[in-house]
Amino acid sequence: MDMKKVQSTCNYCSIACNIDFNVEDNEIVSVVPTQGYPVNNGFCCIKGLNLDKQNTKFPNPVYPLVRGKDGEMEQISWDEAFKVMASKIKELQDKYGRESVAFISTGQLTTEEMALLGHIGRNYLGMNGDGNTRLCMATSVVAHKQSYGFDAPPYTFDDLELSDTLIFIGANPVVAHPILWTRVRNNKNNPKIIVIDPRQSETAIRADEWVDIKPKADLRLLYTLANYLIEKDWIDKDYIEKYTE
């Protein structure tokens, strides 16, 4: 049977990179990022490149996986998985205290699954728990609404290829957002890159200027910058009057 190309999108994040799946005999043979697609243009992160593994690496992806002695992932039964999870959690809590283990939810869970996770974690295991929204988009939504009056960033990836200065605050796109960083690398204006981060991250190493503030000092820095701009009268008063509250 001839090789068939099926074009689709990666479902791992909201960037929605375009992917070409090369299929033969109803089996995925290879995964290739789509050339010329405006979002990722022939590039995607390691997660997208391994999209086929969930269908081809294991004969039955419904069963849970555990890492074996050789470092490879192996399928086990659900009964085994429950016993391993319970024994490992109990072992850690007995050795280090109940607060030594915590759980974090995910936006992929249904409401019922989320309630069950919280019930077991808090009431039976005495664990601390949190939602993925603290690390994901919930905080961004609040900040975007307060800053721009809308719950989404007011820019596109194209801006990263056109800007002459780029500032990253607490972000490490070299590792955490390779698609975005690819757009930065495509910028032909040789932009100045400023990274504000306590960590000397991979992005900070590549920056023109690294501002290594103390942890939790980002708000203090931003308020100071805002105050300085106001004092120097370097703000666009007409724009602020028209578009902010």
Predicted regions and their residues:
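N-terminal export/assembly segments and adjacent metallocofactor-ligating motifs
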Residues: 1-234
